[in-house]
Amino acid sequence: MFTVSQTSRAWFIDRARQAREERLVQKERERSAVTIQALVRSFLCRRRLHRDIRKEIDEFFSADESGSSKRSALCIFKIARRLLFICKTTEDSERLEKLCRSILNSMDAENEPKVWYVSLALSKDLTLLWIKQIKSILWHCCELLGQLKPEILQDSRLITLYLTMLVTFTDTSTWKILRGKGESLRPALNHICANIMGHLNQRGLYSVLQVLLTRGLARPRPCLSKGMLTAAFSLALRPVVAAQFSDNLMRPFIIHVMSVPALVAHLSTVAPERLGVLESHDMLRKFIVFLRDRDRCRDACESLEGCHTLCLMGNLLHLGSLSLRLLEEEMDGFVSALTQMLCYCQKYVAQKKSNLTHWHPVLGWFSQPVDYGLNDSMYLITKQLQFLWAVPLIRILFSDILSRKLLEHAEPAPVQPQPSSPQTVLPVKSLLKRAFQKSASVRNILRPVGGRRVDSAEVRKVCNICVLYQTSLTTLTQIRLQILTGLTYLDDLLPKLWAFICELGPHGGLKLFLECLNNDTGESKQLLAMLMLFCDCSRHLITILDDIEVYEEQISFKLEELVTISSFLNSFVFKMIWDGIVENAKGETLELFQSVHGWLMVLYERDCRRRFAPEDHWLRRDLKPGVLFQELDKDRRRAQLVLQHIPHVVPHKNRVLLFRNMVIKEKEKLGLVETSSASPHVTHITIRRSRMLEDGYEQLRQLSQHAMKGVIRVKFVNDLGVDEAGIDQDGVFKEFLEEIIKRVFDPALNLFKTTSGDERLYPSPTSYIHENYLQLFEFVGKMLGKAVYEGIVVDVPFASFFLSQMLGHHHSVFYSSVDELPSLDSEFYKNLTSIKRYDGDIADLGLTLSYDEDVMGQLVCHELVPGGKTIPVTDENKISYIHLMAHFRMHTQIKNQTAALISGFRSIIKPEWIRMFSTPELQRLISGDNAEIDLEDLKKHTVYYGGFHGSHRVIIWLWDILASDFTPEERAMFLKFVTSCSRPPLLGFAYLKPPFSIRCVEVSDDQDTGDTLGSVLRGFFTIRKREPGGRLPTSSTCFNLLKLPNYSKKSVLREKLRYAISMNTGFELS
């Protein structure tokens, strides 16, 4: 019974709980239903009300359009209130348009005060309501201006309408109510206008105008009419003028308006009178004063970011170009503002692509977001930026430099009269063309004389200007060449800047700048920026000048000045390296080194091609080669950097010794040197004399790099298939190598051609006719590398431009194909450079950007650029044509052949080993010294066989004939007769392998069996079997061996030897 009672009670409680919850849910449903019904009724009521109001408004404007009498201002006011009550910008834009037109029509009414919409502002009851209403209407206009697209015709009409509304009600000048007696109301109404303008500014008027102007102007063809542009710019200027140019309004004007892409350029062409307004308000001066403050300038740049900061710079520069006199007065502030803006952009300029960078057409890789909408304006922006390096601005900024005189203690240099040119000078058509014109000024030889205080106002001013241009070079990376070309436009700027540099400090430029390297002060950085600018500009100028302009016309720099400059640079770079400054250099220090070193190497390479500096000019006498080698052995970084960057400061002979030591060390490391405990691996090859090139190619091309560097033994097989007698102890391989090189470099094979004139070798453009021609070139490279590796000199004279490519010079950004062109074809070079100096119109010559070549009887047209055969050569592109043509002839035509040969050569010779040599020095490394043969050195290192000795009469006669009777050319022929190379080894005959040898022979070569006891004794005691007067001297070039009969008379020896070397009867193997 107790259990049943408990169960019933629980069931009853649960039932009551469920009923209570259901009642609560029902009440919530009813409450929600009421709320929803109220919302729906409210929505439907509002929709009916809005529909009724819109209907009323539509009827109002329909009646207005039907041509009935003009509506009163009060009617417009009331209908405007109703419209503003329900206005949605997207839905009611057409009604808002009609309202604006009605308001503007009312303002145009003549002598009808009740019609003028503005008259309501004078009603005490309506003044505040009217002001509130016009503010609302005008802001709706602003919102629509931010959405409309000016390139669409209908939108452009609406833009004109809304701009007219804004212009009309932010200034009282067009209000007819103020005519006559109403003039007394102007102050009050001006106050109202100022209030309206202040409200719009707070809501974001400047942002709206920026969007409108950018949309209308940042495109290939601007789509804002003169009226639109004038209205928008007037609106932007009004608040600033009204606030008397306060900083609070100058800031948004600069940030939102002056940063519109190429705004000033468009104003100058579309609405030039607006620029007159800017000038009347002295706005440029006010911009400069505002931006020269570091904090305000940084704030503006951070608000704009890099892309729009460039736009602001462009507009300021354009304004400056129109007000040069003002710039003279405000130069310091102008330079400071531009430098700060460039420095801000520079922080985000990246050296290479990454996930965090974006491409900018002027700044390059940029780590801030890039507004690609500006790309269409970039041409005009760049044109505006060009005012920075245009001649008028350069003349103003560098006026102190250009007008200055050298200090009294600078000694004048004698001036050599230059022959006058019969050609008349044409008008300058471009900056680049002007860089080639001859300077008429007479200057002094410049020496580091010192005497100008570095803390003087003049020096600080020049330093600030140099910092500006140097910052522009490192920031505007994609138009760097344009900047350099502009800065080198004036012939006398760089020489006078160099004179200024020489006069800095108490002892002259070098000591001062070396001290600056160790001082991390602002003054030191500015001085070093001046040096960097000078180096960058001078390097650019010398790179684009040809030899005639450098050596004969001596444009900008006299040769004596180049000697002085190169001496300064050589010392400066060496000190930077040797004092450890370069080892850990980064940032500005690294840029300084690259700048100074780049200018130094351009001068050095120019001197290597055609000397202007005295002998041993490039050597550093305070650098002892022994000390350098010791530091290299200890792996000291500074010694390695000297060889990497300025190897020319070390005497050539020492560098050759270093090269040979590098080879020896590698051989030891690879186990290629005979030791007491091990012998190197030997590769044996068998070569048929009749197919020497083919067999050598087949057997050696597959060898590994290690095997090619190792010992290779050659066994020759004669035409009958019989092995030739003799053991190869490097001599036979030397003959094989020389014979291979002789055959592959024979122009008749068409792997190589010779240049016109001096007949130097380079890859043949038509060598592709050979099967597997690229593999052949790689094999040739390996053979040439093997010869250099083993110290075997081969008589292979290469064209200078080809040697430059072997050294990798053509990869340098300062490499000029035109400079190397004379080494390929001097006549072709003269013809090309004559185009640069052509008096008439280049287009009359009928040239195109193409090159026609006769290839095996067929005329082939090579386009220098895509579509080049249809692009005529004009005065504007003739410089490009010259460089393209030179690059095609020396690089494009033989690119694959050159790459294959260099690949083979570098598989034997490491690139870093030969980078310490110049182009002529590399030729000497390959072919031996071009100095006259040192007979005493040769005599000292000669080995005698067959009874000959140093006091033997035949040997005495031989040396006397070589010294007294033979000409230098005949001595070279004699050396080639014995060694197969007409030049002595670079380090002297002590390094000739095998050593130079002379052996007494009594029989012909086919009967010669070598030295026997009898033959040696007969030779020693001058005993002859028979008179050898009818026999000629012979040689075994593979052993550097001269076989000399035991002649009885000196005259016979002289006659036979001269005949033998002229017939070149060498290449015989005993």
From Swiss-Prot:
Pfam assignment, any one: HECT
Gene3D superfamilies: Hect, E3 ligase catalytic domain, Hect, E3 ligase catalytic domains
Known tissue expression: Widely expressed. High expression is observed in developing central nervous system.
GO biological-process terms attached to the record: protein polyubiquitination; regulation of postsynapse assembly
Catalysis performed (reactions): S-ubiquitinyl-[E2 ubiquitin-conjugating enzyme]-L-cysteine + [acceptor protein]-L-lysine = [E2 ubiquitin-conjugating enzyme]-L-cysteine + N(6)-ubiquitinyl-[acceptor protein]-L-lysine
Pathway: Protein modification; protein ubiquitination
Phosphoprotein listed as a keyword: yes
EC class: transferase
Domain HECT: 704-1070
EC number: 2.3.2.26
Thylakoid recorded as keyword: no
N-acetylmethionine modification, residue list: 1
Originating gene: Ube3b
GO MF annotation, one: ubiquitin protein ligase activity
Family annotation (InterPro entries): E3A/B/C-like, HECT_dom, Hect_E3_ubiquitin_ligase, IQ_motif_EF-hand-BS
Active site: 1038
Domain IQ: 29-58
Domain of life: Eukaryota
SUPFAM superfamilies from the UniProt entry: Hect, E3 ligase catalytic domain
Role description: E3 ubiquitin-protein ligase which accepts ubiquitin from an E2 ubiquitin-conjugating enzyme in the form of a thioester and then directly transfers the ubiquitin to targeted substrates. Ubiquitinates BCKDK and targets it for degradation, thereby regulating various metabolic processes. Involved in the positive regulation of neurite branching in hippocampal neurons and the control of neuronal spine number and morphology, through the ubiquitination of PPP3CC.
Gene Ontology CC terms: glutamatergic synapse; mitochondrion; postsynapse; postsynaptic density
Residues where Phosphoserine is found: 421
Disruption of the gene: reported phenotype: UBE3B knockout results in growth retardation, decreased grip strength, and loss of vocalization. Knockout mice show corpus callosum hypoplasia, enlarged ventricles, and decreased thickness of the somatosensory cortex. Brain-specific conditional knockout (cKO) leads to impaired dendrite arborization and increased density of dendritic spines in CA1 excitatory and cortical pyramidal neurons, and alters the electrophysiological properties of neurons and neuronal networks in the hippocampus.
Protein name (record): Ubiquitin-protein ligase E3B
Subcellular location(s) per record: Postsynaptic density
Primary location: other
